[in-house]
Amino acid sequence: MYKIIFLFSALLLITACDPAKKEAGRLLTQEYPDLYEAVFQRDADAIFSFTSHEDERVKAQAWQALINTPVSDIDRLIEEVSKANLKEAWASLWLQELSEAHIEQLNKLFIASDASNMGLVSVLGEKGNTRSLKLLLEEPVPPNLEMEFQLAYAIGRLTGNVETTTEQQLEIVERALTSTNSKASQAYLYGFYRNRSNTEKQKLGKEAIDKMIELWKNFYPEEIGPDRYIAALLMNNHSGLVFHHFVDKDYISMDVQLAIEMIQGIAQNEKNDTYAPVALNAFLYHKSPNVVIQALRTISRKESYAEELDNSILNETALNIGVEDHVRLAGFNTSPNAKKYIKDLLTIGTEDPYLQPLRYAALKKVWDESKVFDYMIADIDTSDGLLYSTLLTELNNLWANADDELKSQERNETVNEVLFSALEKGARTFLMHALYSDENVLNENDFETLLMLLENKSVEDDSDVFRSVTSVLKNRFEERSEEVITQLYQNAGNELKETIIAQEWSFIEDSLAPVTFRTPDWDRLADLGPNPIWVLDTKKGDIEITLDVLTAPATISGMDSLIRNGDYTGVAFHRVVPNFVIQGGDVETGRGFGGPDYTVPTEASAAHYFRGKAGVASSGPDTEGSQYFFMHVWGPHLNGRYTIFGEVTKGMSVVDRITQGDVVRNSYWK
């Protein structure tokens, strides 16, 4: 008993003696609430008043709040930013609408300054013009690593947006491949890398490419980023040189991001070197499932490669029970001889909703459409929940692309039955657009049947059914539905009214109410402290994220409510884009279409989206909810546009191995 009391007392003492937590608590409970009243209104003038706050942290947060707040008086904003001269203040200009006169004003400010003003440099990178690029290139390479990176990124960003001369390209390439600062080397090349596949953008010229090849021979960056970019830039016309450059590397254990970059380069190249299939074969043995999956996708696009590598495809992936189902199905989609092993294929991924697209893609390779249709209908009849939802999507896709021969009267009737069953369950209609749009599936006689689905239904208890049925009525029977919808709207609660307004019926004149943001629990945030650690337990290992409460309090307060309620537990990573992000946290649909019952504002910052950063997904400014993502690689095009709420501080190797459908088994505070 005494021991328990002693430990509890010690914990209280530690908390009381933690000055960082104490100060964060003061800010969160005493200063932030007033600032966030202004943020919730996106009131630029009210937010401005906090930029002169006596507390530096509040001041910085106010400037960052202006990144996503439209400001009408840009002249005043530039003047105030110049006076403050903080990186957060300069960041407030990133997304504002600037005129050519404003950009020239920024150029003049830079002439009076230098590269040490990293905030101003960042704005020129985002908003600058041809003259801005010239001025930045006239700057000598700064001795400070961070300053060099910021200058390099501004130059790299601008090369993606403005025309460059041959001399400028040569200078940028030389800077990139002679720097000992890996982050800066990569940043210099950013614009060329981003534009490499864009036919409407300027490409790196022959002279600059030749210079790059010459310098690359003796370039040994400490980090993999520069090599990734160089490989991507050279793969199209110099793939043999790229393979030779990495000839001493073990492709089986190659850095995940570099391996994926090379595989994607092979996929985009019409004239690959003879070593390409050798490299792809080696990548089939890679430790990362994402590398293997990418290699399989590339092989499937090259018919001759698939024939040549089929033994490895079958033995290492499709028929290998030691690898995950995602890899096996990707293998079956790639093998030209998958039909021989249909019994094996039919046993894989039957209950995993996230594998149905791969599963049915493979079945379409070995069966005709009618057999796939019959099998799919049987699957739908015996499924529910998320699996049911994904199978509806597969049926919709099959029907949208099917030949007329498949669409017999009998199958039209079958699809009609599936459609009405789905509507009665409240399934989302965008999953079934091809089904209800087909007049042979849903005809004029079905109008009354649709109305019958709403009989004896409660608006409160069956809101999903009302949402689904009214959506189909809007798309197919808008004129006939006017009386029904008008009466329904008059008697509806707020949720159904908002649904009907969002459907944009021609006779409903009301508009959606402004979004009301969730109010943070400031006292709870103070208890969490400035940097709590959130743990996601997956079958591939734990991912630990150190959160930044003072930068994204509204975001983290909402997430905290979901974490404590167990809402993230059992929710999968529904989106995986290799060499970009993994994304999860859709606590509503599990597929990326939904979120929680609240909205929080975008909480942008002056920080970069480096590898490992944790961000919040959105469909635009101030639409954030529960979905989160972790960066595989540096993605500066997201800077200022998406909330950064923390960083993965343990488990990045797990992040690299996550594939679509991997589930968070448990989610908790450390």
Please state what every model-predicted region is.
Residues 9, 184, 258, 291, ...:
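Catalytic-loop motifs flanking and including active-site residues across diverse enzymes
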Residues 4-13:
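Sec-dependent N-terminal signal peptides
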Residues 20-22, 40-52, 70-81, 99-111, ...:
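Amphipathic alpha-helical scaffolding segments comprising HEAT/armadillo-like alpha-solenoid repeats
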